[in-house]
């Protein structure tokens, strides 16, 4: 599976009054190190990007930054935020600027995406949300931006039931949690961690009732 990119843009940096370096900070928790980025949508614009201006897959954070510079936009923060198939198409829900290019995927299958419950991260105006897929269906949202990934890390304050404290799969991981209706928190581990420890960070240290896994070995920030 390939990755696509989720981006925070400063469309009017001076009037927003938030410097790019203020978005993210290091955090240590239970012998692991993380980079944590808090994004308040009342102050910062959050968007999803897949293709460049010519309709070609971006493929890298460098290509993304270059594409945005060509449009006169400044990149404040970027993180890969989902999974693609070999044809570079998202395997789950993908909405960009209100246009749904891929419908919600509720099928069973193999791989992290299909470890249910998986979930959806979405943006609507200055609101942000993280919800398990079946819960998202009931919300009947019409988001501006959305990406489906999996598995969920934390569901309504509980760590995903399939995670084990003694899990032996250790990788660099990244994901997103919801702090409140306007604030998302994005995290990437600086060292390899298992799913349980990553989920515990969101639940216990960052106090996120819902959090979603984005990517493993190829995580980038």
At which residue positions do the language-model features occur?
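Zymogen propeptides
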Residues: 17-112
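Short, intrinsically disordered/low-complexity patches at protein termini
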Residues: 3, 14, 209-210
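Generic hydrophobic, helix-prone segments enriched in Leu/Val/Ile
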Residues: 3, 61-65, 121, 128
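Hydrophobic h-region of N-terminal signal peptides that target proteins for export
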Residues: 10-18
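A broad, structure-centric signal for solvent-exposed, well-ordered loop/edge residues
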Residues: 8, 86, 101, 160-161
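Active-site beta-strand/loop microenvironment that shapes enzyme catalytic pockets
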Residues: 74, 104-221
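Sec-dependent signal peptide recognition
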Residues: 2-10
């Amino acid at each position: 599976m390939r990755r696509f990119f989720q981006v925070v843009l400063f469309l009017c940096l001076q009037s927003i009054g938030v410097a790019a370096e203020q978005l993210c900070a290091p955090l240590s928790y239970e012998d692991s190190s993380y980079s944590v980025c808090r994004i308040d949508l009342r102050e910062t614009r959050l968007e999803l990007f897949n293709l460049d201006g010519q309709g070609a897959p971006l493929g890298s954070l460098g290509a993304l930054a270059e594409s945005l510079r060509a449009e006169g936009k400044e990149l404040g923060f970027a993180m890969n935020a989902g999974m693609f198939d070999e044809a570079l198409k998202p395997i789950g829900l993908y909405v960009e600027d209100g246009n749904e290019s891929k419908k919600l995927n509720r099928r069973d299958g193999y791989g992290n995406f299909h470890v249910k419950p998986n979930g959806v991260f979405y943006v609507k105006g200055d609101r942000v949300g993280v919800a398990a897929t079946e819960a998202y269906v009931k919300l009947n949202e019409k988001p501006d931006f959305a990406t489906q990934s999996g598995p969920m890390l934390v569901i309504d304050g509980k760590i995903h039931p399939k995670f084990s404290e003694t899990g032996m799969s250790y990788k660099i991981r990244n994901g997103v949690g919801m702090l409140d209706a306007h604030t998302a928190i994005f995290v990437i581990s600086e060292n390899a961690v298992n799913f349980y420890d990553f989920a515990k960070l969101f639940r216990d240290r960052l106090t996120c009732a819902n959090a979603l896994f984005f990517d493993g070995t190829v995580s980038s920030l």
